Amino acid sequence: MRSSKIRCPGAIRVGTLVTAFGCLPHVAFAAAREAPPVTPEVLVRLADIGTMSASETTPLLSLSPDGRYVAFQVRQADPVTNLNVFRMVVKATDGATDAIDVDVGGEYLFWTIPSWGYARNAPSGANLTIQPRWSPSGTHLAYLRQDQGRVRVWRASVKGEGASPVIEDAYDIEDVQWLDDNTLIYSGRPGFVEAEAEIEREGRRGWVYDERFHPLTGARPRVLEPISIVYQVLDLKTGTRRAATPTEVARLREKPDPLRAMVGRTTFSVSRTDPQNINAPTTLVARRGEGEPVRCDEEACQNITRMWGDETANVLYFLRREGWASNEMALYRMPADALKPVRIWHATGLLQGCERQAKRLICAQESALQPRRLVTLNLTSGQMSPLYDPNPDLSRYRLPKVERLTLRNRNGIEVFSDLVLPPDYQLGTRLPLVIVQYSSRGFLRGGTGDENPILPLATAGFAVLSFHSPRSEASYQRFTSPIAQSKAEYSNWRNRWNILHTLEDLIDDLDRRGVIDPARVGLTGLSDGATTVHFGLINSHRFAAAVTSSCCTDSFTASVMNGPRISGALKAYGIETDQADDGPFWAATSFVVNASRLDTPLLIQSADEEYLGALPGFTALQQARKPVELIIYPNEHHVKWQPAHRLAVYNRTIDWFRFWLMDQSDPAPDKAAQYDRWRALRALRQKSPSPTPAP
């Protein structure tokens, strides 16, 4: 695959607008109006480096021992075959040669971790980030790959001479590392397989319903902790295996600390200014040898997310979040013997998985109109240059306009979000607004969970608010534990009111500017964003249509569907799982007790794994003769992972908002039944009594 040759470190800025043509060659400006639009089909096929849920510290990339090459995994969805294609890619860090696909294949490997006392949680739907491991000589990669449901270790030649499995066991391999060019250490949990087999045997007599069950994700007991990790060493030449020594285990378990670095005899780390306050600012601390720690008092030393030491130059480099509501990322350079950092780069986009290579960082980078790609960032000048773009063709499409919004909400909290407008938007035109939640850092794809296609919605004529949830009021207060803070946030749904008020403040701001029609506002959400949808429809009159990816926020879902283990844990965090829907806690969020006073058309696009939790609220709305539709996608999880389903969700979301906010329909014959149902819902709505106004 060829790497991108487009020299476009970032989009062109005109005031606060990011132009749709920021990454087009100059010769393309004349033809921009003829460029094709970004459709759901285009969006769903964009290739991804790593996983959709990557953070600044997610290890997306792997540098070769000599620093000349970088390896990473690329995933691309195909909605026609309903498959995700995985490629292991090697790219020269100097950009001189094209990237090489050293392996193509494998199945979608779900990200699962121990949580809530379960040995392995139910898949969220996000894929596991696969970080390949370089052999000491730099000739091969070792990495995890799943085929036919089994996770094995594969080895690939970095010259593209072939790849094959080298470690297979009766259990899934969970981690791997080289000890030398011919020896690998790997880990897994054979006890998990044994525990699953015991559950299968128990099923012959019938399972006792107990704390092992999580009904929302299945009717089968889950394996509980603890399950021991086993470490094995494989000799690739002889094929012999043995138990790993403690020293070898330490080699595998050792992971770099993103918030710790050495420069000479000075150790740099990050600590809170008040160790007893979980919300106290974090700041840089330097300790020379065995001396006393010295705290950096500069504002630039706070909110650090990554750091690297350069002993040759006697310099520390670090990334931090800064600016209004921490909406920017910045890179700083600081002499090791003087706590005076100097900023050398900043932007509103994202840098993820950065690795230092001599005087450069190699990072995965994305911005509002730029999907994730690889870039180099010069540690002296701050100049960013593209290294590898898995989606070079996106630049030929006609992209919407993006404006970064900043305001202080009615609670005094700094907020940022992004306004996305159609490519041909004319100033002064009022558009229907669709709100997509609840993170707006990086590429504006589909919001959290990637279900609400921002660019195609804008292309369809909507203004789109890519909403970034504000910090909670409680996060500015002193708490000694997350549980204590959570209880404060759930008290009277304090944080949910803060989110809803922020949404209303942004709607009012866009209304004052004449950008939107406040009578035609749609709201979407997944996970925590879905809770905001439920809360917003009950407690506000601002929303004319809504789409949610899960449902509902009520006593049944929190207590019954979460099972005894999780429901008990949720209660400790301030969620009243033992209170009925008509009690004071759930009255603000439950459709069951509020159905008669709602009137907003609601589309629920649920995974089959979660739809049972939607039935009480959905049924209450149906019985109250309210406009609601429930779509269930088979073999899906909290985040939908199948390309065909993602495309269907994209298209149905656009159709729903076009129908309710624009009074438009798609004439495609295969959608006739859909619109028959929706016209029946509209007729039902017109016959229903007026809803009770929100408080």
UniProtKB/Swiss-Prot annotation:
Changing residue 438 to F: Loss of activity. It holds the Pfam family Peptidase_S9. Changing residue 562 to A: Decrease in activity. InterPro entries: 6-blade_b-propeller_TolB-like, AB_hydrolase_fold, Lasso_peptide_isopeptidase, Peptidase_S9_cat. Its EC number is 3.4.-.-. The active site is at residues 527, 610, 638. Disulfide bonds join 296-301, 354-363, 551-552. The keyword ATP-binding does not apply. Residues 1-30 form the signal peptide. The record marks 438 as: Catalytically important residue that stabilizes the alkoxide intermediate. Moves to point toward the isopeptide bond. It is found in: Cytoplasm. Changing residue 111 to A: No change in activity. One of its GO terms (cellular component) is cytoplasm. GO terms for molecular function: serine-type endopeptidase activity. NCBIfam families: lasso_peptidase. This is Lasso peptide isopeptidase AtxE2. It comes from Asticcacaulis excentricus (strain ATCC 15261 / DSM 4724 / KCTC 12464 / NCIMB 9791 / VKM B-1370 / CB 48).
